[in-house]
Amino acid sequence: TAPASHAQNLPAAEGTCALPAHVADTELPAPDPQLAQLLRFATGAGVRVAVIDTGVAPNPQLRRLIPGVDLVDPESPDPFFDCDSHGTVVAGVIAGASRGVAPDAEILSIRQTSMRARQPGPQGDAGSLQTLADAVHFALDQRARVINVSVVSCLPPRLAGRVDMGPIRAALARAEAEGALVVSAAGNASESCEPGYTVVPAHEPTVLAVGARDGDHSIAAYSMPVPGPFVSAPGLVEAALASDGSGWASGTAGRPGRKDAVQPYLGTSFAAPAVSGAAALLIQRYPHLSPAQLRALIHAAAQPGGAAVDPLAAVAQLPPATVAPRQPAVTIEPARESAAPARWLRLV
């Protein structure tokens, strides 16, 4: 698996961490005016959101950051180490104090993959579908109600039928049964992830898949298509939490050969957490919502055309008793001896 950020699909020297391109407070764009209206309904208080990603670095903007587990480096675990400058950005979209959708939500950091500081686990499987399943189980053990997955595995048709999907489907079925909504990035189109490929977990029936849209509200060209219902959110984060401990960043700096370049935080990775934040608000208002009801409410609040999620419309909807969602069928496939090994996840 790898993060679903358009910017992070770039090679980096092993052990070289991404450098946030800092932005002064005076240079920040104005916050979304809708955020103030959202907070009149809910703030995410009491809702735990698991961020399965590259780790989440502490930042003063993350007031309720909880250490989870480090599946990348189990010998020297640090779920707060974000070498990729990815998971921290995701967490900030969800629960940043000034600009997050659900600023009072708890963030549970689960470090599951890294493109820059990968240190294989005992089985050499850090960042695999197996550790993704393990991460979901850990999130459920820690009572997360929303699980944000901005890392995906993109399987070409020739491999999709050979990969053992049993463990991840079992984890997703448990999440559905225990009342946790799984939100996933739809994935970014690239040479290694083309339309027609299977994107895991975004293409699973109980997962709320989120595509990215551009500033004009159209679906971004890089956003992978989803075979079933989906929603969309902005794919660009102009004011992100810096992963080096404080302040804001507009992207990562210091790409090889272009040290002065700034690669923006752009991709379906950063669209998914906006929806996870909206889900946290809904759960605070209606704690007994099932994942199926949450999906139905969020879909109902999406605007026609590009399925753009309107968090304010979602949170201000009528009580969920008026919602009658269709329950997706979930089939757990047993492991097969001929199954191919799980593919690495990618940052999207």
Give residue spans per PLM region.
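Second-shell loop/turn segments in exported
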Residues: 38, 75-81, 120-126, 158-166, ...
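Protease zymogen maturation seam
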Residues: 2-46, 60-61
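Extracellular S/T/G-rich loop segment that most often corresponds to the catalytic His/Ser-adjacent loop
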Residues: 53, 202-284
